[in-house]
Amino acid sequence: MSADWSYLREKSASRLAPSMAKDHPNLPVVKEEGCYYYGVDGVKYLDFTSGIAVTNVGHRHPKIVQAIKEAADHLTHGPIGVIQYESILKLADELADILPGDLDCFFFANSGTEAIEGALKLAKFVTKRPYVVSFTGCFHGRTQGSLGVSTSKSKYRKFLQPNGLTYQVPYFKPSDPRILDEEGEVVESLACELLEEEFTNLFKYHVSSEEVAAVILEPVLGEGGYIIPPASWLAKVREICNRHDILLIFDEVQTGFGRTGEWFAAQTFGVTPDIMAIAKGIASGLPLSATVANHKLMQQWPLGSHGTTFGGNPIACSAALATLDVLKEENLLDNAREVGAYARERLNLLKEKYEMIGSIRSVGLMIGIEIIDPQTKKPDGAAVLRILDLALQEGVLFYLCGNEGEVIRMIPPLSVTKEQIDDGLDMLQRALVKYKEETHQPASL
């Protein structure tokens, strides 16, 4: 590490907020390319985080870089509304072609939480209803409105008193004994019956369905632990919304743009929402997001009811267009399904060898590896942190999720190869071995 880097690292704790300076692992890097980061230490690291599900086509893809350079030669800033430009109009057209159902009208912003804020405002405005129902464990952002529907961790809401116009029902929980058969397998019909009961009680005792504008959820629980519900469970949510004339919002900030093996998780599960929030993988690292609805719904949201200065930036829109091209041209959705299935097979083999691995949760290349205490079978977030450190020493970068940080989050670029999966999981296995040695676990564990 250079003297300048060392100095800057020492200063980071005082110059950057703790959420930036003290997150895990804060790896100092100088370059990114494909599925790799290049550290200031000269080490090449295999990246299984994709910038937290952002660089789905790989880091610094040449086509994205070229699109950014060409766009910057013409326009660097809008704002849309004051002027119009080709990239935002073309992007809206191309997104409409890949989104499910009739989701074809857009309000562009910069980040996932902004897209959620827009979705909540739109739903309340057009329904003229004040309340929103969200699901326990879901994460939708850290601004005031999105925080009000986020319950993945209580610390995110501490002292902030998010507005009280929200209610929660439990998200699908695959370990809930009420929905399991004698072999411990999920009975989907029981899960749907339980969901129906939760909503019935909510509408009976807490809030009238006639006052609920929207139900919002992540089709795959992301920050809350990569919980994957059955398609029938999501279909039941859709049915309940239809019955009560409530709008359904999907937060596809993390699941979108091929992560689940389809363009969006809505297509993976065959359930189409009324409103969708998209971000992260849309522009390969440039700030861009969108609140999406059908034309009829969006046109009820008049001029001045929402706004943006930077949303739909022309350079970001150009990067998004190039991102869509790469996803199509390189068949990355197919690769996500194929390589994702291969990764799951390899992880299941690891699970057979290491009792500290609880469940493997995967759809496409959205993969969670639960770590538990082999003796108590309880989630072990402390173990995850140490295992991630050891894996980084081996040369692979993972992230974490779950209420207790108990899940290793594996979200490589959709361009990842089977060989790179092998490399990364070999490194993870070596980290597991070292962790067992450090903690003096018996060989059988």
From Swiss-Prot:
Cross-referenced CDD domains: OAT_like
Gene3D superfamilies, per database record: Aspartate Aminotransferase, domain 1, Type I PLP-dependent aspartate aminotransferase-like (Major domain)
Top-level taxon: Bacteria
Cofactor (UniProt): pyridoxal 5'-phosphate
Keywords, sorted A to Z: Aminotransferase, Pyridoxal phosphate, Transferase
Entry EC number(s): 2.6.-.-
InterPro entries: Aminotrans_3, Aminotrans_3_PPA_site, Class-III_PLP-dep_AT, PyrdxlP-dep_Trfase, PyrdxlP-dep_Trfase_major, PyrdxlP-dep_Trfase_small
Keyword Transferase: yes
Modified residues (N6-(pyridoxal phosphate)lysine): 280
Family recorded in the similarity comment: Belongs to the class-III pyridoxal-phosphate-dependent aminotransferase family.
Protein name: Uncharacterized aminotransferase BpOF4_10225
Organism placement in taxonomy: Bacteria, Bacillati, Bacillota, Bacilli, Bacillales
